Regions:
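Positively charged, phosphate-engaging catalytic surfaces used for nucleic-acid and nucleotide handling
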Residues: 207-339, 343, 347, 378
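N-terminal Rossmann-like or analogous alpha/beta NTP/dinucleotide-binding catalytic cores
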Residues: 39-40, 45-269, 298, 428-431
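Intrinsically disordered, low-complexity coil segments
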Residues: 178-179, 200-205, 217-218, 273-279, ...
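Non-catalytic terminal extensions that flank enzyme cores
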Residues: 1-139, 159, 281-282, 298-371, ...
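Short, well-ordered alpha-helical segments
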Residues: 189, 291-295, 409, 413
Length: 443
């Protein structure tokens, strides 16, 4: 009789073991599917872990705490970015008109991380701009991209003789082995058109020159030769660490970073743009999130004997949801990322529905007026620093929200209007013939 309960218990154990075995098999299948189809897990993947784009490094450098605050310290040190004061003599004496005012505005709104080699701006007319067209999930532009393009456009307006080189890093996509040539070419053209729509809207004509790495390297022996020599000398360890290249990546994955680096060499363009001699210095303006992509430019400058590039790094824009990473266009979720392809109605809906509010107390209007709004937590307040171009208006909005004089809904509406105004430029612009801007034509 005593053995029966044990026997019964043994049967239960067998049942449990079978159940556990089934669960393990189930989990194994899930894990296998997850590995085979990484895109299916994108919803739970925090922004900043862009595995398919090759941009995994920033997520390990820029830590995001529970409140959504980003710590820039490690990135600033790693990329040699130093703080810039609004009265910096190098900026004030720069021959690039309007640069001091633009940077002062960014500094006052606390959205500029700093710069590297800014002493090269002092009394220097021989500057050219490079903007890299980075591939991601969308042909549409995200707010972080529009913000950078707006800074560049402001400089071009003040300096119509300033040359802007747009480099299309299409070879990066080929190195992943997931796209065919025609797919990448079409994708590049469509995204480039959106970039050009924003930059060329208005009456002023700018000196904009475009090239794609794949096409240029086939047609210009000098480009291919410079990069080939550089690849032989660059530190393999540094290259793989910066771009997080692993043993699983194809050999071609070590190529595209070297082509990106060589784009800062002015002599590369002299044949097509005669004024860009070796005396010129490249200026790159981008989010600090993307600054890892330009670090090899310093290695290339030393090896190939041209001027080291100047970097100006802006802060990272948080996502609408506030606490899960970066408003980065890579593998992002359409419903919480602001894109130029959004119609006015859907753009407003995204902002009103998903942007985190900085309300205090119990969330009622009464408590909001009593305790004021949290301008640090509120996403609309954060975004206004990037999209409101009038400093007085920006300060007024922040002050009123902090005092509870502007509601969460009202500050969201103000932010929506600013973003929509910028996006409308792309949305409402006429089609642009991108081929007109290539300085080396395809036959």
């Amino acid at each position: 009789m005593e053995g029966k309960p044990e026997e019964k218990h043994g049967k239960e154990n067998k049942k449990e073991n079978k159940k556990e075995k089934k669960e393990k098999q189930k989990e194994g299948k899930k894990e296998k599917n997850k590995n085979e189809n990484p895109k299916k897990d994108n919803k739970n993947k925090p922004k900043g872990t862009e595995e398919e784009s090759g941009c995994k490094i920033p997520s390990t450098i820029f830590k995001v705490d529970e409140s959504g605050t980003i710590d820039y310290t490690q990135g600033l040190d790693l990329y040699g970015i130093k703080n810039i004061e609004s009265n910096d003599e190098n900026i004030k004496s720069s021959e690039i008109k309007g640069l001091d005012n633009i940077l002062k505005l960014l500094i006052d709104k606390k959205v500029l991380c700093g710069g590297r080699n800014i002493e090269k701006l002092k009394s220097n007319k021989k500057i050219f701009l490079v903007y890299e067209l980075i591939f991601n999930d969308h042909i549409n532009l995200a707010l972080n991209e529009i913000f950078i393009l707006d800074i560049i456009k402001s400089l071009l307006k003040e300096n119509p003789d300033l040359n802007l080189i747009i480099q299309i890093a299409d070879d990066e996509l080929y190195s992943k082995g997931k796209f065919k040539f025609n797919q990448v070419s079409k994708f590049a053209m469509e995204k480039l058109e959106n970039v050009l729509k924003y930059l060329t809207s208005g009456d002023t004509k700018f000196k904009i020159h475009v090239f794609s790495n794949t096409s240029f390297r086939l047609k210009d022996n000098n480009y291919e030769s410079l990069v080939s020599n550089f690849k032989m000398k660059v530190s393999f360890e540094r290259l793989t660490k910066l771009f997080n290249i692993t043993d699983d990546d194809p050999v071609s994955a070590i190529d595209y970073p070297c082509y990106i680096a060589m784009a800062t060499n002015p002599s590369l363009y002299t044949q097509y743009i005669p004024e860009l001699t070796n005396e010129y210095t490249c200026l790159i303006i981008n989010s600090i999130y993307n600054m890892y992509r330009y670090q090899l430019g310093y290695d290339a400058a030393q090896e190939c004997k041209f001027n080291e590039p100047i970097l100006l790094a802006t802060k990272i824009i948080s996502p609408l949801t506030g606490t899960n990473g970066y408003e980065c266009n890579f593998n992002s979720q359409d419903d919480i990322t602001l894109l130029t392809g959004d119609e006015e109605k859907s753009l407003r809906k995204k902002i009103m529905k998903h942007s985190v509010s900085g309300s205090r107390g119990n969330g009622s209007m009464e408590d909001h007026k009593k305790f004021g709004g949290d301008v640090i937590k509120d996403i609309s307040c954060q975004y206004l620093a990037f999209v409101e171009k009038d400093l007085n208006k920006y300060n007024e909005y922040i002050e009123k929200f902090g005092k509870g004089e502007l509601s969460c809904g009202e500050i969201k509406d103000i932010m929506f209007k600013c973003v929509n105004e910028m996006f409308k430029v792309v949305r409402d612009s006429k089609n642009v013939n991108v081929n007109d801007y290539y300085f080396i034509k395809d036959n």
